[in-house]
Regions:
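N-terminal/domain-start alpha-helical segments
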Residues: 1-121
Length: 122
């Protein structure tokens, strides 16, 4: 089973996204910030990280930089900010995809599958 780490501080998004991803056959663990994400990744292997750009604890760009420096795991940004600067910054930091909110659930699943396929995990 594919394990996804969801790094998101909005509890409503965590609940709805976790439920949807679980129904699609993914095992989801969630944390609300960079420190917790780094700790969980060190303790448990994740196959993919879904990462919000705006976190109450730090920011997603710094989290992506830290995750990519220490772990070999694909990262998909989820963000309400779909501006060009944010998108380019995300990709420059090593993000594998960038999905603006609100997103369509089926598109999210397609993008997850695509990233997993490109990294050899599906």
């Amino acid at each position: 089973m594919i394990k996804i780490l969801l790094v998101e501080d909005d509890k409503i998004i965590v609940a709805s996204l976790s439920e949807y991803l679980n129904s699609e056959g993914y095992l989801v663990r969630s944390v609300s910030g960079q420190a917790a994400a780094m700790k969980l990744l060190a303790e448990e292997k994740a196959d993919l990280v879904l990462l919000d750009v705006s976190l109450a604890e730090g920011n997603g760009f710094a989290a992506c930089r830290a995750i990519k420096a220490e772990f070999d795991v694909p990262v998909i940004f989820l963000t309400a900010s779909g501006d060009e600067f944010s998108t380019v910054t995300g990709f420059d930091l090593g993000a594998d995809d960038y999905i603006p909110k609100p997103f369509r659930p089926r598109e999210l699943i397609s993008r997850i599958r695509n990233v997993l396929r490109l990294t050899g995990l599906s």
